[in-house]
Amino acid sequence: LHPHGEAQADIEIAKAVREGVGNEMKLMMDSMWAYQYEDALRVGRAIEELDYYWYEDPLVEEDVYNYIKLKQKLDIPIMSTEYAPGRFYGMAQWITQNATDMLRGDVAITGGITPLLRLCHLAEGFNMKCEIHHGGNSLNNVANLHVIMAVPNCEFFEYFPCTGANEFGLVEDIRYLEGHVNAPTEPGLGYQIDWDLAKREHVATAE
């Protein structure tokens, strides 16, 4: 869920969704850095009771002090570090300060396939998950998919079907069936690059 960022309204939304889908579906709350500590704690306790699977980005990522406090008060796993400063070395500080239960990254934000793999391995060394954020466009989604299938500590492939300007770069986009995506079997990224699009949109060539 990406709710509105107002604590009481977000709690009501979380309740309504849980009632709507029942208890079998895993639900997660992404508050998108919306709260101060008190509201973050209030929402966290509410979604714990609703059996939400994790609690993402309740506070701004500069507020490590209150993340530590929040993690001490709540049982629901906290996930943060999507845009945390310091990237690889900064993430190590989040782990050693016990400020989050799971790391977050993707090929675009983290800096590519290799840095994202390093981040996953860093989390793995502490027996933690590194859940990979959606890529935002077709090419990034495919690159994320490769990393997810190469590491043992990412449970979900977060995928928003691309539309409009974000659907580019591939002859055919990722297809999923009943919530599942199959691994590509072709070389490289495993999907055919749309070179015709690249030629049509070509502006200049750097020598």
Short names for language-model regions:
Residues 1-140:
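Catalytic core of soluble alpha/beta enzymes
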Residues 114, 119, 135-207:
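Flexible C-terminal active-site loop/helix
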